[in-house]
């Protein structure tokens, strides 16, 4: 089962530097997705969304997409139109080749005042007598239905015959409701209305129903899992399988405590290989300043900074820069800035109070010593 994750969204948002908060368009077609999730919360400025050729059975989780103009859900398992009332700017909706059978559900789209293009080609509801007239009358804002322009005379005819059409459509909706209850009873009794079918060559045949599409997906996933297991077993049984597995295993990143326990100290690390400088005498010896040359156009959402009393960790696209410190600092006083000119990252951390006190005492001792030396020179000169 494919799922919509933050990682998937960022990979599909490479044209926007992986930033999701201001993403305008994203394509998630052919990802074996069964449920819409995360998009409505992570990408609230989305205007164009492609979810075609998946296994989505319900329209949900899109109520926060106030700027969404085009939604493509063609070739999925959707049986009912719902969940789009919050998409105030929606102009185009494509539900081609789904399983919407109850044409009355199009009335849920009345709230979408700007909707002027609707595609329902290939859905069972298009075979209902009076389908087009019913939709044209139910959605007066429509300019185009199933790729054909809605003309004024067609709208007038639909209005005149609305009573007869409504009777036929409601009767069909009632039949569909009874059929749905029957299907639920089959499922409750753990029976299948779609037993496996094979042709004369013994090849598996599938029908065009939501259940059989999902069954096809499950069988494909099981076949892929079985092939991976067989491949893994072959590699494991080969002479150099164990060695190859050890070499290909990604090293686990150690925590600071684990690194000290293993090496006796913290190591300097630069996994992203970015230039950086460390100034431990900044502000007249009162603070530490770490400057990292981060690429100018890299999104700030891909940068994370962690400061502890004796080290600084900077994660750039999940790659670690670790800088041990010779003196303890005060993490609560950290100040992080990013240059809008060249993207440079500047981290300033003041030293811990006891370190500042030691620095101050050392400075006073140095000044007294310099004062005594100056007095001795003056006495030698007068003598």
Curated annotation (Swiss-Prot):
Q: Which GO terms describe its biological process?
A: axonemal dynein complex assembly; centriole replication; cilium organization; epithelial cilium movement involved in determination of left/right asymmetry; epithelial cilium movement involved in extracellular fluid movement; establishment of localization in cell; flagellated sperm motility; outer dynein arm assembly
Q: Does the keyword Coiled coil apply?
A: yes
- InterPro entries noted in UniProt: CS_DNAAF11_C (IPR056496), Leu-rich_rpt (IPR001611), LRR_dom_sf (IPR032675), U2A'_phosphoprotein32A_C (IPR003603)
- Any idea where this protein resides? Cytoplasm, Cytoskeleton; Cytoplasm, Cytoskeleton, Flagellum basal body
> Which domain of life does the UniProt lineage start with?
Eukaryota
Q: What does this protein do?
A: Involved in the regulation of the cell cycle; is required for the basal body replication and new flagellum biogenesis.
What name does the UniProt record give this protein?
Answer: Dynein axonemal assembly factor 11
The species is Trypanosoma brucei brucei
